[in-house]
UniProtKB/Swiss-Prot annotation:
Family statement: In the N-terminal section; belongs to the N-acetylglucosamine-1-phosphate uridyltransferase family.
Source species: Streptococcus thermophilus (strain CNRZ 1066)
Designated name of the protein: Bifunctional protein GlmU
PANTHER family: BIFUNCTIONAL PROTEIN GLMU (PTHR43584:SF3), NUCLEOTIDYL TRANSFERASE (PTHR43584)
SUPFAM superfamilies: Nucleotide-diphospho-sugar transferases, Trimeric LpxA-like enzymes
Entries under Pfam families matching the protein: Hexapep, Hexapep_GlmU, NTP_transferase
A single MF term (Gene Ontology): UDP-N-acetylglucosamine diphosphorylase activity
Binding positions (Mg(2+)): 102, 227
Positions of the catalytic residues: 362
Protein purpose: Catalyzes the last two sequential reactions in the de novo biosynthetic pathway for UDP-N-acetylglucosamine (UDP-GlcNAc). The C-terminal domain catalyzes the transfer of acetyl group from acetyl coenzyme A to glucosamine-1-phosphate (GlcN-1-P) to produce N-acetylglucosamine-1-phosphate (GlcNAc-1-P), which is converted into UDP-GlcNAc by the transfer of uridine 5-monophosphate (from uridine 5-triphosphate), a reaction catalyzed by the N-terminal domain.
Matches recorded under NCBIfam families: glmU, PRK14354.1
Gene3D superfamilies documented for this protein: Hexapeptide repeat proteins, Spore Coat Polysaccharide Biosynthesis Protein SpsA, Chain A
Cofactor: how and how many bound: Binds 1 Mg(2+) ion per subunit.
Length: 460
């Protein structure tokens, strides 16, 4: 029998105090909505329906092409939100999962277990529950003396006895699809919130003698719904621990996993060593036996095997195997450092390809350049690539030697085995095997220093 899914993503999230819809706030690199969608995908629904409302177009963009959408123009409660999905699911045979888009910690495994429990017990409705040490604010699961679920009571509607119950409603359910939409026609707004509660369909099913069950999560953390920035930080913390644990199990060494921040889509090979205060974001990939030291920050980049990145930033770039970067280097977008490259202290590379075994040890800027292999950059080298309106390219061939404090005025080509003298400003192309000197000849004025204030003879 087919499975379907309804993701509730219409709310504004007032307590987030944000212009961004609540479900679009990110946890470990992707939106909460994407986390939920990925978990839901594990049950392989025949159809996904996402209920959107506040800033609908922004929410639609996240799952465009992956889900059907339906609008909830007025936020009149969870029951009302599910009603909006009827046009997409009416009359279909099967089970429908209903889940909120602000529950980023739920796992696909738990949702699959929930579906299996529902089917195996032949329930009309199954509630995903959890046991909370502090259940305040949650809807409570009320059972009879036989342990059967009789109803769900919201916090504001719960009496003193019901408020003591620690089994809580996570806001995730599985329903017989046809019976869900039939029951929704019979709910009303006679409650403290004046809303259509989805939970009221549970009471309707019970009154009709239909079977309602509950499947309890093993891990309460999965039930977290994010309603404010405090809960968002909690979700980030839980997700970080999960991600780092998974990498450690797969052979990655963490100096301090509590101070290492890795997005959910990052890939790390075995035998990588990661020191504290490292951040890996986006689609970053790190090759085997690499070392990332304290303070390294890498975004959407590929790092080859056996590299060492020392306290440096790398953005949208590729670093091939055996390269070393840092400390205090900045590899800006669209750069490629080929095998064995060394980029050292206070070196910035932007939009450039650096050939094999090339070295730029310190205090250098390489921008919009094509650099061959075995090139050496002396300290203080600058590629001057921008004239205020346009950017120009510098091309440096294999085995060139760029003397310290060279200023290379692009567009410029430097040939194989060429050398620029230290302190030169190079404005013209340098042929292969040539030495380029672009500086004034030194003139010594003997005895002139005696008249200068620093000279001992001028001291009083």
């Amino acid at each position: 029998m087919s499975h379907y899914a309804i993701i509730l993503a219409a709310g504004k999230g007032t307590r987030m105090k944000s212009d961004l819809p609540k479900v679009l706030h990110k946890v470990s690199g992707i939106t909460m909505l994407e986390h939920v969608f990925r978990a839901v995908s594990v049950i392989e629904p025949a159809k996904n329906v996402t209920v959107i409302g506040h800033k609908a177009e922004l929410v639609r963009e996240v799952l465009d092409g992956q889900s059907a959408f339906t609008m909830q123009t007025e936020q009149l409660g969870t029951g009302h939100a599910v009603m909006m999905a009827e046009e997409e699911l009416a009359g279909l045979e099967g089970q429908t999962l209903v889940i909120a888009g602000d529950t980023p910690l739920i796992t696909g495994e738990s949702l699959k277990n929930l579906i299996d429990f529902h089917v195996n017990h032949k329930n009309v409705a199954t509630i995903l529950t959890a046991t909370a040490d502090n259940p305040f604010g949650y809807g409570r699961i009320i059972r009879n003396e036989n342990g059967e679920v009789t109803k769900i009571v919201e916090q504001k509607d719960a009496n003193e006895f019901e408020q003591q119950v620690k089994e809580i409603n996570t806001g995730t359910y599985v329903f017989d699809n046809k019976r869900l939409f039939e029951a929704l026609k019979n709910i009303n707004t006679n409650n403290a919130q004046g809303e259509y509660y989805l939970t009221d369909v549970i009471s309707i099913f019970r009154e009709n003698g239909e079977k309602v069950g509950a499947y309890t999560l093993r891990d309460f953390e999965e039930s977290l719904g994010v309603n404010d920035r405090v809960a968002l930080a909690t979700a980030e913390d839980v997700m970080r621990r999960r991600i780092n644990k998974a990498h450690m199990i797969n052979g990655v060494t963490f100096q301090n996993p509590n101070a290492t921040y890795i997005d959910v889509d990052v890939e790390i090979a075995p035998d990588v060593v990661i020191e504290a205060n490292v951040t890996l974001k986006g689609q970053t990939k790190v090759g085997a036996e690499s070392v990332l030291t304290n303070g390294t920050y890498i975004v959407d980049s590929t790092i080859g095997a056996n590299t060492v990145i020392t306290n440096s930033m790398i953005e949208h770039s590729v670093v091939e195997k055996g390269a070393t970067v840092g400390p205090f280097a900045h590899i800006r977008p669209d750069s490629m450092l080929k095998e064995g490259v060394h980029i050292g202290n206070f070196v910035e590379v932007k939009g450039s390809t650096i050939g094999e075994n090339t070295k730029a040890g310190h205090l250098t800027y390489i921008g919009n350049a094509e650099v061959g292999s075995d090139v050496n950059f002396g300290a203080g080298t600058i590629t001057v690539n921008y004239d205020g309106q346009h950017k120009f390219k510098t091309q440096i061939a294999n085995n060139a030697f760029i003397g310290s404090n060279s200023t290379l005025i692009a567009p410029l080509e430097i040939g194989d085995n060429a050398l620029t003298a230290a302190g030169s400003t190079i404005t013209d192309n340098v042929p292969a095997d040539s030495v380029a000197i672009g500086r004034s000849r030194q003139v010594n004025k003997e005895g002139y220093a005696i008249k200068k204030p620093h000279h001992p003879s001028q001291q009083k």
